[in-house]
Amino acid sequence: MESLSELSVQFSQLSMFPFFDMAHYVVSVMSAREQAGALDIAARSPMASWFSAMLYCFGGGILSSILLAEPPIAVLSNTTNIMLASTIWYMVYYFPYDLFYNCFFFLPIRLIIAGMKEVTRTWKILSGVTHAHSHYKDALLVMITIGWARGAGGGLISNFEQLVRGVWKPESNEFLKMSYPVKVTLIGAVLFTLQHGHYLPISRHNLMLIYTMFLVLIKVTMMLTHSTASPFLPLETPLQRILFGQRQKPSEVRQSASSSGAKGKPSKKTLDKDSGEQSKKKDS
């Protein structure tokens, strides 16, 4: 147990710059490039492509700044990170023969950088929770919101990023249909907020290690199995039925109404039989 505790302490002291930040930028820019029409936008308007990639890379910081009434442009003040992310953007989109993109698209390398990006997610959530606490003492909801925004800001502002590329898909709003990264970031924000308020009987560095190991394990498993379904789905479905009920779809309501109407309505054969019996009674 002591060795595990020492490991978690050393892990919590890891520096994200430059290697983990680089992995985050590479994965984010590659994700931006793989969106529909992204290469066409890069050829026609490099500035729009660059801005879209920066939203993927720094969306969490921008969104959390807006929520805390801080200048969102402050993200640009970190010249080193902006230059690093911009260099990676250029190499992902414009490197000759796509050698840079294809190198990191190679599955073993992509698994490594994807795992490193999940490590940065933990640090971003924790920094958001801590930053919110410095503004609003013990405001749990605010701390959860800012931690969530900083850890999953790129997904939460995806509609705005789509507008930069000239695309409008309101049905893809993360609040309507949350993706796995947004869900797991929300869970992480809740956990780190409860730990920060001493509501969880676990140290911060142990929680950081356990949560990060969970993130990396699930991410690698999903990539190896090519799964896009949320791992939380087996829990979400029964919980939704228990807590919020299971409402019938409009099509099911119409079908049930038509079937009940058909059951209550006599058939044509029955009507003909009844009318024949009534005519016989009249003749007699």
UniProtKB/Swiss-Prot annotation:
Keywords in alphabetical order: Endoplasmic reticulum, Ion channel, Ion transport, Membrane, Potassium, Potassium channel, Potassium transport, Transmembrane, Transmembrane helix, Transport
Catalytic activity: K(+)(in) = K(+)(out)
Membrane-topology descriptor: Multi-pass membrane protein
Location of region: Disordered: 246-284
A GO cellular component entry from the record: endoplasmic reticulum membrane
Protein name in the entry: Trimeric intracellular cation channel type B-A
Lumenal side: 1-15, 69-79, 122-137, 196-206
Subunit and interaction comment: Homotrimer; conformation seems to be controled by binding to diacylglycerol (DAG).
Binding locations of a 1,2-diacyl-sn-glycero-3-phospho-(1D-myo-inositol-4,5-bisphosphate): 117, 121
Residues annotated as transmembrane: 16-33, 47-68, 80-99, 103-121, 138-155, 178-195, 207-224
GO MF entries: identical protein binding; potassium channel activity
GO terms of biological process kind: regulation of release of sequestered calcium ion into cytosol
Its biological purpose: Intracellular monovalent cation channel required for maintenance of rapid intracellular calcium release. Acts as a potassium counter-ion channel that functions in synchronization with calcium release from intracellular stores. Activated by increased cytosolic Ca(2+) levels.
